[in-house]
Amino acid sequence: MILEILKYPDIRLKKKAQKVHSFAEIQVLIEDMIETMYAAPGVGLAAPQVGISLRVAVIDTSPPDQKNPFVLVNPEIISQKGETSIEEGCLSLPGPRALIARAEKIFVRAQDAQGNPLEKEVEGLLAIVIQHEIDHLNGRLFID
C-alpha cells in the first residue's frame, strides 16, 4: 500500500523516532515503505516521513531498472571518515534542494527487517542517503 508522505512543516517530521522492539509488527510497514519509496520516486524513506515514529528506514540507490531495497532498523553511525558535498532533495520537502556536507564513508550498525544484527561500512551515495535518513529518524531535515 502506498503511504502518504508528510510534507514540511508537519510537526511530526521534527520528532525523534522511537526504537523498534517488535520486528513482527513492522513487516507490513517495511513493505509499504518500500512501495511508497519506489512510487514517489525516491532513493530513501524514513518511517517518520509517513507518520510512524519508529527508527526504520528503507533505501535503494540501485539503477532505476533494478530494485535492491536495503532496510535499516534502529540504525546508528559508529564512525565516519572524510567529507563530501552533494545537492540533496527530500520527499518531505518537494522542490528545494541544497548542497549538504556529509561524511564520505560511514560505519553503520543496525538491524535488518528480521531483527538480525547488521554492521556495514559504506561510502558514496549509499553513505549519503543513510545519513539523510538517520537525520529524519532524529527529527532533522536537510534544511535545519
Could you describe each region identified by the protein language model?
Residues 1-144:
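Positively charged
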